[in-house]
Regions:
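A residue-level detector for the "anchor" residue at the start of short, highly conserved motifs
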Residues: 68, 72-85, 95-386
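Membrane-interface anchoring determinants
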Residues: 1-8, 22-26, 30, 34-116, ...
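Positions in alpha-helical segments
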Residues: 7-11, 23, 311, 347
Length: 386
């Protein structure tokens, strides 16, 4: 009985396999269990692949370390840098592996899809709107922005606002193809993903709860503790749930088109409420709230995968192509069409960078499909999957 061996895979990837060995490998990896073994081997033998591609192992290592240092400089959340490092290496593994195969290229009729960037619209209490974007600064009596984040002017930060002061709200809207950071008056940091909108007060009132509302979309919260704010509790509301926070880090995903609102706790403790139902979450747990009921399900999750977007990454683990395309459509501001239901069910696992072009992302996904079962065609800002 013919078996799939490491040496056969190595020969193939190093382009040393003869015609008979290539035919043998193709036959073996057509079997489901061997196909999985083949993928696992290539992912865990990255340095070997680098030597095949570059014929210089030390140079390959240096390239990885340089890439890691670049990511480290970009990353705001120190606690999760190690995950970004690992993900960067995984992405390079994919590139090294998939370039070995000969597949049909993604068809592009017109290149008009651009990578997402820092941009948002600030709606002031009087209805005026301010465009915030990379390379453009803004400042008024209350706020200032460097084009990447919106912060309160230092002179306007105050923990002693009168309890009888009227609460005035602003809105920050991040369009499709964008992301933006918001630093609230109490020191809480919020990172908004594409196609998201948050309602927040200009000032929190002394002795009252600190409340914000995620109207739709996805946001990561790093909440300033109650101890630093005269014991005031922090509350985040969505259309279906309310989250009570003491001081913690968590992610909420609540897009209008989704039937499930997910809340993932990274650090601390939060209480999730949906009608009369409520649960307490511990780190590495996620709540799922059905928008059509009062049920709250709790499960353990891989935190890195759930918050990979804040590190500039896409992380997919046996994710359906339908869900992947939904994620990509928000970041690249595009539309997509499936020619049949079968393509929607295709599963993909991998960690990719959000700074890559849509063509690069689709290339990787396409190359993981056996027998060319997935093909993409780009027409203007529409991706057709067949």
């Amino acid at each position: 009985m013919i078996k799939l061996t490491d040496s056969l895979i190595v020969k193939y990837l190093s382009k040393e396999a003869n015609l008979f060995e290539k035919e043998e490998l193709n036959y073996l990896i057509s079997k489901k269990k061997n196909h999985k073994l083949f993928k696992n081997f290539t992912y865990t033998n990255y340095l070997s692949l680098m030597s095949f591609n570059n014929h210089d192992l030390d140079k390959g290592k240096r390239n990885i370390y340089n890439r890691i240092r670049l990511i480290e400089k970009r990353n705001k959340l120190e606690r999760y840098k190690k995950y970004a490092f690992a993900a960067s290496v995984i992405f390079l593994i994919g590139i090294s592996l998939f370039n070995q195969f000969n597949f049909n290229e993604t068809k592009i009729t017109k290149e008009s899809i651009i990578i997402g960037s820092d941009k948002a619209v600030l709606t002031l209490e009087n209805g005026d709107q301010v465009i915030l974007e990379k390379g453009k600064t803004f400042q008024n009596k209350t706020f200032n922005s460097n084009g990447k984040e919106l912060s309160y002017s230092i002179k306007n930060r105050s923990a002693n606002n009168p309890s009888n002061q009227k609460i005035v709200y602003n809105f920050l809207t991040v369009p499709r193809g964008g992301q933006f950071s918001l630093n609230l008056e109490d020191g809480t940091e919020v990172l908004l993903n594409s196609d998201s909108k948050i309602k927040f007060p200009i000032k929190f009132i002394k002795g009252k709860k600190r409340e914000v509302e995620l109207l739709y979309g996805e946001a990561f919260f790093d909440v300033s503790t109650s101890q630093n704010n005269n014991g005031s509790e922090f509350i985040v509301s969505t259309k279906t749930q309310k989250i009570n926070v003491i001081g913690t880090k968590f992610n909420i995903k609540a897009y209008d088109e989704d039937d499930i609102v997910t809340t993932t706790l990274v650090e601390g403790k939060i209480k999730v409420q949906n009608g009369e139902s409520q649960v307490l979450l511990s780190p590495n747990q996620q709540s799922k709230v059905d928008t059509k009921s009062t049920n709250i399900d709790v499960l353990n999750v891989d935190v890195f995968q759930e918050i990979s977007w804040i590190n500039g990454l896409f992380s997919f683990n046996d994710t359906s192509l339908e869900n992947i395309m939904q994620t990509l459509s928000r970041w690249y501001d595009l539309k997509f069409i499936f020619k049949s239901v079968n393509e929607k069910k295709f599963l993909f696992s991998g960690v990719l960078e959000r700074t890559k072009s849509i063509e690069d992302i689709l290339f990787i996904i396409e190359k993981t499909s056996s027998l060319n079962e997935i093909n993409f065609e780009i027409i203007d800002k529409v991706i057709i999957i067949e």
